[in-house]
UniProtKB/Swiss-Prot annotation:
Keyword Transmembrane: no
Residue ranges of the region described as RNA binding: 243-249, 267-271
Function per UniProt: Catalyzes the base-exchange of a guanine (G) residue with the queuine precursor 7-aminomethyl-7-deazaguanine (PreQ1) at position 34 (anticodon wobble position) in tRNAs with GU(N) anticodons (tRNA-Asp, -Asn, -His and -Tyr). Catalysis occurs through a double-displacement mechanism. The nucleophile active site attacks the C1' of nucleotide 34 to detach the guanine base from the RNA, forming a covalent enzyme-RNA intermediate. The proton acceptor active site deprotonates the incoming PreQ1, allowing a nucleophilic attack on the C1' of the ribose to form the product.
Enzyme class: transferase
Catalytic activity: 7-aminomethyl-7-carbaguanine + guanosine(34) in tRNA = 7-aminomethyl-7-carbaguanosine(34) in tRNA + guanine
Name of the protein in question: Queuine tRNA-ribosyltransferase
Source organism of this protein record: Acidithiobacillus ferrooxidans (strain ATCC 23270 / DSM 14882 / CIP 104768 / NCIMB 8455) (Ferrobacillus ferrooxidans (strain ATCC 23270))
Amino acid sequence: MSIFQLLARDGAARRGTIRLPRGTVQTPAFMPVGTYGTVKAMSPEELKTLGAEIILGNTFHLFLRPGLEVISAVGGLHRMMHWDRPILTDSGGFQVFSLGALRKLTEAGVQFRAPTDGHMVFLGPEESMQIQAALGSDIAMVFDECTPHPASYEEARVSMELSLRWAARSHAAYAGPGELFGIVQGGMYADLRRRSLAGLQRLDFPGLAIGGLSVGESKVEMMQVLDDLMPHMPADRPRYLMGVGTPEDLVEGVRRGVDMFDCVMPTRNARNGWLFTRDGVLKLRNARYEKDVLPPDPACACYTCQNYSRAYLRHLQRSHEILGARLNTLHNLHYYQELMAGLREAIAAGRLDAYADDFYRRRRAGSLVGA
Protein backbone atom coordinates (compact mmCIF):
# COMPACT_ATOMS: atom_id res chain seq x y z
CA MET A 1 0.00 0.00 0.00
CA SER A 2 1.35 3.42 -0.97
CA ILE A 3 2.34 5.81 1.80
CA PHE A 4 1.03 8.64 -0.39
CA GLN A 5 -2.64 9.53 -0.67
CA LEU A 6 -3.76 12.01 -3.33
CA LEU A 7 -6.53 14.31 -2.09
CA ALA A 8 -6.81 16.87 -4.89
CA ARG A 9 -5.18 18.02 -8.12
CA ASP A 10 -4.98 21.36 -9.87
CA GLY A 11 -3.18 20.90 -13.17
CA ALA A 12 0.02 19.05 -12.32
CA ALA A 13 -0.04 20.24 -8.70
CA ARG A 14 -1.01 17.73 -6.01
CA ARG A 15 -2.57 18.04 -2.57
CA GLY A 16 -2.04 14.91 -0.53
CA THR A 17 -0.72 13.19 2.58
CA ILE A 18 2.26 10.99 3.40
CA ARG A 19 1.44 8.48 6.14
CA LEU A 20 4.35 7.57 8.41
CA PRO A 21 4.35 5.78 11.80
CA ARG A 22 5.19 8.97 13.72
CA GLY A 23 2.61 11.11 11.94
CA THR A 24 0.91 12.14 8.73
CA VAL A 25 2.54 14.85 6.62
CA GLN A 26 0.29 17.20 4.65
CA THR A 27 1.66 17.89 1.17
CA PRO A 28 3.01 19.93 -0.48
CA ALA A 29 5.34 20.18 2.52
CA PHE A 30 8.45 22.14 3.42
CA MET A 31 10.92 20.45 5.78
CA PRO A 32 13.05 22.72 8.02
CA VAL A 33 16.66 21.55 8.03
CA GLY A 34 18.18 20.33 11.30
CA THR A 35 21.73 19.60 10.16
CA TYR A 36 23.24 18.69 13.53
CA GLY A 37 20.05 17.43 15.15
CA THR A 38 18.63 20.90 15.67
CA VAL A 39 16.87 23.42 13.45
CA LYS A 40 19.13 26.33 14.28
CA ALA A 41 17.73 28.69 16.95
CA MET A 42 14.43 26.79 17.26
CA SER A 43 13.08 24.41 19.91
CA PRO A 44 10.95 21.42 18.87
CA GLU A 45 7.92 23.01 20.53
CA GLU A 46 8.38 26.15 18.45
CA LEU A 47 8.67 24.10 15.26
CA LYS A 48 5.39 22.37 16.06
CA THR A 49 3.70 25.70 16.74
CA LEU A 50 4.92 26.93 13.36
CA GLY A 51 3.29 23.91 11.69
CA ALA A 52 6.31 21.76 10.85
CA GLU A 53 5.21 18.12 10.55
CA ILE A 54 8.55 16.70 9.40
CA ILE A 55 12.14 17.92 9.63
CA LEU A 56 15.40 16.92 7.97
CA GLY A 57 18.52 15.58 9.67
CA ASN A 58 21.97 15.25 8.14
CA THR A 59 23.48 11.76 8.15
CA PHE A 60 27.00 12.95 7.30
CA HIS A 61 27.27 15.51 10.09
CA LEU A 62 25.47 13.46 12.75
CA PHE A 63 27.72 10.47 12.00
CA LEU A 64 30.81 12.63 12.55
CA ARG A 65 29.42 14.57 15.52
CA PRO A 66 28.19 13.48 18.04
CA GLY A 67 28.48 10.02 16.43
CA LEU A 68 26.30 6.92 16.50
CA GLU A 69 27.60 5.73 19.88
CA VAL A 70 26.33 8.88 21.58
CA ILE A 71 23.04 8.98 19.66
CA SER A 72 22.35 5.32 20.43
CA ALA A 73 23.23 5.79 24.11
CA VAL A 74 20.57 8.48 24.51
CA GLY A 75 17.87 6.48 22.75
CA GLY A 76 18.11 7.54 19.10
CA LEU A 77 17.82 10.78 17.19
CA HIS A 78 14.15 11.46 17.96
CA ARG A 79 14.63 11.11 21.71
CA MET A 80 17.88 13.08 21.69
CA MET A 81 16.17 15.95 19.85
CA HIS A 82 12.91 15.69 21.83
CA TRP A 83 11.09 15.47 18.50
CA ASP A 84 8.28 12.91 18.20
CA ARG A 85 7.27 13.65 14.61
CA PRO A 86 8.85 12.26 11.40
CA ILE A 87 12.47 12.90 10.46
CA LEU A 88 13.91 12.51 6.96
CA THR A 89 17.66 11.96 6.78
CA ASP A 90 19.73 12.55 3.68
CA SER A 91 22.31 9.92 2.82
CA GLY A 92 25.45 12.04 3.11
CA GLY A 93 26.05 11.94 -0.64
CA PHE A 94 25.65 15.69 -1.16
CA GLN A 95 27.98 16.57 1.72
CA VAL A 96 30.63 14.19 0.38
CA PHE A 97 30.18 15.79 -3.06
CA SER A 98 30.77 19.19 -1.45
CA LEU A 99 34.21 18.08 -0.22
CA GLY A 100 35.50 18.24 -3.82
CA ALA A 101 39.19 17.35 -4.10
CA LEU A 102 39.31 16.22 -0.46
CA ARG A 103 37.45 13.00 -1.34
CA LYS A 104 38.43 9.84 -3.22
CA LEU A 105 35.56 8.30 -5.18
CA THR A 106 35.53 4.60 -6.13
CA GLU A 107 32.89 2.04 -7.05
CA ALA A 108 32.83 0.96 -3.41
CA GLY A 109 32.08 4.42 -2.04
CA VAL A 110 33.90 7.56 -0.94
CA GLN A 111 36.94 8.00 1.28
CA PHE A 112 37.59 11.40 2.82
CA ARG A 113 39.11 13.19 5.77
CA ALA A 114 36.55 14.22 8.36
CA PRO A 115 36.27 18.01 8.47
CA THR A 116 35.87 17.73 12.26
CA ASP A 117 39.31 16.30 13.11
CA GLY A 118 40.95 15.08 9.89
CA HIS A 119 40.67 11.33 10.48
CA MET A 120 40.02 9.11 7.46
CA VAL A 121 36.41 8.04 6.91
CA PHE A 122 34.86 5.68 4.36
CA LEU A 123 31.21 6.05 3.39
CA GLY A 124 29.42 3.81 0.91
CA PRO A 125 25.84 2.68 0.37
CA GLU A 126 25.96 0.00 3.08
CA GLU A 127 27.52 2.34 5.64
CA SER A 128 25.01 5.09 4.88
CA MET A 129 22.10 2.66 5.29
CA GLN A 130 23.49 1.39 8.60
CA ILE A 131 23.85 4.94 9.91
CA GLN A 132 20.35 5.99 8.87
CA ALA A 133 18.86 2.82 10.36
CA ALA A 134 20.67 3.54 13.64
CA LEU A 135 19.36 7.11 13.61
CA GLY A 136 15.82 5.75 13.37
CA SER A 137 14.95 7.80 10.29
CA ASP A 138 11.29 7.82 9.24
CA ILE A 139 12.45 8.44 5.66
CA ALA A 140 15.98 7.47 4.64
CA MET A 141 17.62 8.31 1.33
CA VAL A 142 19.74 6.10 -0.91
CA PHE A 143 23.44 6.88 -1.12
CA ASP A 144 24.14 8.66 -4.40
CA GLU A 145 26.66 10.83 -6.17
CA CYS A 146 25.46 14.36 -6.72
CA THR A 147 26.37 15.06 -10.35
CA PRO A 148 28.42 18.28 -10.51
CA HIS A 149 27.43 21.25 -12.63
CA PRO A 150 28.44 21.82 -15.31
CA ALA A 151 28.95 18.22 -16.45
CA SER A 152 29.36 16.86 -19.96
CA TYR A 153 26.88 14.26 -21.16
CA GLU A 154 29.43 11.49 -20.61
CA GLU A 155 30.30 12.71 -17.11
CA ALA A 156 26.60 12.89 -16.21
CA ARG A 157 25.98 9.41 -17.64
CA VAL A 158 28.81 7.81 -15.68
CA SER A 159 27.70 9.55 -12.49
CA MET A 160 24.04 8.59 -12.98
CA GLU A 161 24.88 4.94 -13.61
CA LEU A 162 27.07 4.84 -10.49
CA SER A 163 24.19 6.30 -8.48
CA LEU A 164 21.87 3.61 -9.85
CA ARG A 165 24.26 0.86 -8.78
CA TRP A 166 24.56 2.49 -5.37
CA ALA A 167 20.76 2.73 -5.17
CA ALA A 168 20.49 -1.03 -5.71
CA ARG A 169 23.07 -1.65 -2.97
CA SER A 170 21.26 0.79 -0.67
CA HIS A 171 17.98 -1.02 -1.33
CA ALA A 172 19.53 -4.39 -0.53
CA ALA A 173 21.28 -3.17 2.62
CA TYR A 174 18.60 -1.04 4.25
CA ALA A 175 17.05 -2.63 7.34
CA GLY A 176 15.84 0.48 9.12
CA PRO A 177 12.41 1.16 10.59
CA GLY A 178 11.44 3.80 8.04
CA GLU A 179 10.88 4.16 4.30
CA LEU A 180 13.75 4.35 1.80
CA PHE A 181 13.48 6.82 -1.09
CA GLY A 182 15.36 6.66 -4.38
CA ILE A 183 17.07 9.69 -5.93
CA VAL A 184 16.87 10.59 -9.63
CA GLN A 185 20.16 11.90 -11.05
CA GLY A 186 21.35 12.67 -14.58
CA GLY A 187 22.42 16.30 -14.56
CA MET A 188 20.73 18.58 -17.07
CA TYR A 189 20.07 15.77 -19.57
CA ALA A 190 16.43 14.71 -19.95
CA ASP A 191 17.16 11.23 -21.32
CA LEU A 192 19.60 10.46 -18.51
CA ARG A 193 17.04 11.60 -15.95
CA ARG A 194 14.44 9.30 -17.47
CA ARG A 195 16.90 6.38 -17.51
CA SER A 196 17.67 7.02 -13.85
CA LEU A 197 13.97 7.12 -13.02
CA ALA A 198 13.32 3.86 -14.88
CA GLY A 199 16.11 2.11 -12.99
CA LEU A 200 14.79 3.33 -9.65
CA GLN A 201 11.24 2.26 -10.49
CA ARG A 202 12.46 -1.29 -11.02
CA LEU A 203 13.61 -1.24 -7.39
CA ASP A 204 10.10 -0.15 -6.31
CA PHE A 205 11.02 2.60 -3.84
CA PRO A 206 7.99 3.99 -1.93
CA GLY A 207 9.07 7.55 -2.75
CA LEU A 208 11.35 9.29 -5.23
CA ALA A 209 13.51 12.38 -4.97
CA ILE A 210 14.98 14.66 -7.62
CA GLY A 211 18.63 15.29 -6.75
CA GLY A 212 21.46 17.19 -8.37
CA LEU A 213 19.64 20.51 -8.64
CA SER A 214 20.38 23.86 -7.01
CA VAL A 215 24.09 23.13 -7.55
CA GLY A 216 24.91 26.11 -9.76
CA GLU A 217 22.52 25.76 -12.68
CA SER A 218 20.23 28.63 -13.71
CA LYS A 219 16.58 28.76 -12.67
CA VAL A 220 15.64 28.19 -16.30
CA GLU A 221 17.74 25.01 -16.39
CA MET A 222 16.27 23.78 -13.11
CA MET A 223 12.70 24.25 -14.28
CA GLN A 224 13.49 22.63 -17.64
CA VAL A 225 14.68 19.52 -15.81
CA LEU A 226 11.41 19.45 -13.85
CA ASP A 227 9.33 20.08 -16.97
CA ASP A 228 11.01 17.13 -18.69
CA LEU A 229 10.98 14.76 -15.71
CA MET A 230 7.82 15.33 -13.68
CA PRO A 231 5.33 13.96 -16.26
CA HIS A 232 7.16 10.61 -16.03
CA MET A 233 7.19 10.39 -12.22
CA PRO A 234 4.82 7.76 -10.78
CA ALA A 235 1.59 9.31 -9.55
CA ASP A 236 1.23 7.05 -6.51
CA ARG A 237 4.56 7.97 -4.87
CA PRO A 238 5.64 11.17 -3.08
CA ARG A 239 8.03 13.37 -5.05
CA TYR A 240 10.78 15.22 -3.20
CA LEU A 241 12.86 18.06 -4.70
CA MET A 242 16.07 18.09 -2.68
CA GLY A 243 17.77 21.25 -1.42
CA VAL A 244 15.35 23.70 -3.08
CA GLY A 245 14.78 26.57 -2.33
CA THR A 246 13.45 30.09 -2.62
CA PRO A 247 9.75 30.91 -2.23
CA GLU A 248 9.56 31.18 -6.03
CA ASP A 249 11.17 27.73 -6.36
CA LEU A 250 8.54 26.27 -4.05
CA VAL A 251 5.66 27.80 -5.99
CA GLU A 252 7.06 26.64 -9.33
CA GLY A 253 7.93 23.19 -8.02
CA VAL A 254 4.42 22.72 -6.65
CA ARG A 255 2.94 23.82 -9.97
CA ARG A 256 4.93 21.02 -11.61
CA GLY A 257 3.83 18.32 -9.15
CA VAL A 258 6.50 18.32 -6.41
CA ASP A 259 5.27 17.21 -2.96
CA MET A 260 8.25 17.79 -0.64
CA PHE A 261 11.00 20.39 -0.29
CA ASP A 262 13.88 21.18 2.06
CA CYS A 263 16.34 24.05 2.16
CA VAL A 264 18.53 25.91 4.66
CA MET A 265 17.51 29.23 3.10
CA PRO A 266 14.88 30.38 5.63
CA THR A 267 17.12 29.66 8.62
CA ARG A 268 20.44 30.76 7.10
CA ASN A 269 18.99 33.95 5.67
CA ALA A 270 17.37 34.69 9.03
CA ARG A 271 20.77 34.63 10.74
CA ASN A 272 22.02 37.06 8.09
CA GLY A 273 19.13 39.45 8.69
CA TRP A 274 17.12 38.66 5.55
CA LEU A 275 13.41 38.27 6.26
CA PHE A 276 10.91 36.83 3.78
CA THR A 277 7.65 38.75 3.48
CA ARG A 278 4.68 38.72 1.15
CA ASP A 279 6.13 41.80 -0.54
CA GLY A 280 9.67 40.55 -0.99
CA VAL A 281 12.83 40.28 1.10
CA LEU A 282 13.49 42.72 3.95
CA LYS A 283 17.21 43.22 4.60
CA LEU A 284 17.55 44.44 8.16
CA ARG A 285 20.99 46.02 7.80
CA ASN A 286 19.58 48.63 5.43
CA ALA A 287 19.65 52.03 7.14
CA ARG A 288 16.08 52.74 6.04
CA TYR A 289 14.87 50.50 8.90
CA GLU A 290 16.86 52.21 11.68
CA LYS A 291 13.77 53.96 13.13
CA ASP A 292 11.05 51.91 11.45
CA VAL A 293 8.35 51.02 13.98
CA LEU A 294 6.50 48.63 11.64
CA PRO A 295 6.80 44.86 12.12
CA PRO A 296 8.70 42.98 9.40
CA ASP A 297 5.39 42.08 7.71
CA PRO A 298 2.29 43.90 9.01
CA ALA A 299 0.07 41.12 7.62
CA CYS A 300 2.03 38.31 9.33
CA ALA A 301 0.63 36.60 12.44
CA CYS A 302 3.94 35.18 13.70
CA TYR A 303 5.24 35.97 17.20
CA THR A 304 8.00 38.19 15.83
CA CYS A 305 5.69 40.36 13.73
CA GLN A 306 3.11 40.60 16.52
CA ASN A 307 5.64 41.93 19.03
CA TYR A 308 8.73 43.51 17.46
CA SER A 309 9.63 46.35 15.11
CA ARG A 310 12.00 46.45 12.19
CA ALA A 311 14.07 48.98 14.14
CA TYR A 312 14.54 46.61 17.09
CA LEU A 313 15.32 43.63 14.87
CA ARG A 314 17.85 45.75 12.98
CA HIS A 315 19.47 46.71 16.30
CA LEU A 316 19.68 43.04 17.34
CA GLN A 317 21.19 42.11 13.97
CA ARG A 318 23.85 44.82 14.11
CA SER A 319 24.63 43.90 17.72
CA HIS A 320 24.94 40.18 16.88
CA GLU A 321 22.44 39.32 19.61
CA ILE A 322 21.22 35.71 19.78
CA LEU A 323 17.63 36.87 20.24
CA GLY A 324 17.76 38.45 16.80
CA ALA A 325 18.64 35.14 15.15
CA ARG A 326 15.81 33.44 17.02
CA LEU A 327 13.17 36.02 16.15
CA ASN A 328 14.27 36.19 12.52
CA THR A 329 14.28 32.39 12.18
CA LEU A 330 10.85 32.10 13.76
CA HIS A 331 9.48 34.60 11.26
CA ASN A 332 11.08 33.02 8.18
CA LEU A 333 9.95 29.50 9.07
CA HIS A 334 6.44 30.82 9.75
CA TYR A 335 6.49 32.45 6.32
CA TYR A 336 7.54 29.19 4.63
CA GLN A 337 4.95 27.09 6.46
CA GLU A 338 2.21 29.63 5.67
CA LEU A 339 3.27 29.63 2.02
CA MET A 340 2.89 25.84 1.90
CA ALA A 341 -0.47 25.99 3.68
CA GLY A 342 -1.65 28.56 1.15
CA LEU A 343 -0.52 26.36 -1.73
CA ARG A 344 -2.33 23.35 -0.26
CA GLU A 345 -5.55 25.34 0.15
CA ALA A 346 -5.28 26.76 -3.37
CA ILE A 347 -4.84 23.30 -4.92
CA ALA A 348 -7.81 21.93 -2.98
CA ALA A 349 -9.95 24.86 -4.15
CA GLY A 350 -8.79 24.60 -7.78
CA ARG A 351 -7.36 28.11 -7.76
CA LEU A 352 -3.59 27.56 -7.79
CA ASP A 353 -3.00 29.78 -10.83
CA ALA A 354 -4.81 32.67 -9.13
CA TYR A 355 -2.80 32.09 -5.94
CA ALA A 356 0.48 32.08 -7.87
CA ASP A 357 -0.52 35.19 -9.83
CA ASP A 358 -1.21 37.03 -6.56
CA PHE A 359 2.07 35.76 -5.09
CA TYR A 360 4.08 37.22 -7.99
CA ARG A 361 2.00 40.41 -8.22
CA ARG A 362 2.72 41.28 -4.58
CA ARG A 363 6.42 40.57 -4.95
CA ARG A 364 6.65 42.73 -8.08
CA ALA A 365 4.77 45.58 -6.42
CA GLY A 366 6.49 45.28 -3.03
CA SER A 367 8.74 48.05 -1.79
CA LEU A 368 11.07 45.65 0.05
CA VAL A 369 12.77 43.86 -2.84
CA GLY A 370 16.47 44.71 -2.87
CA ALA A 371 16.01 46.82 0.25
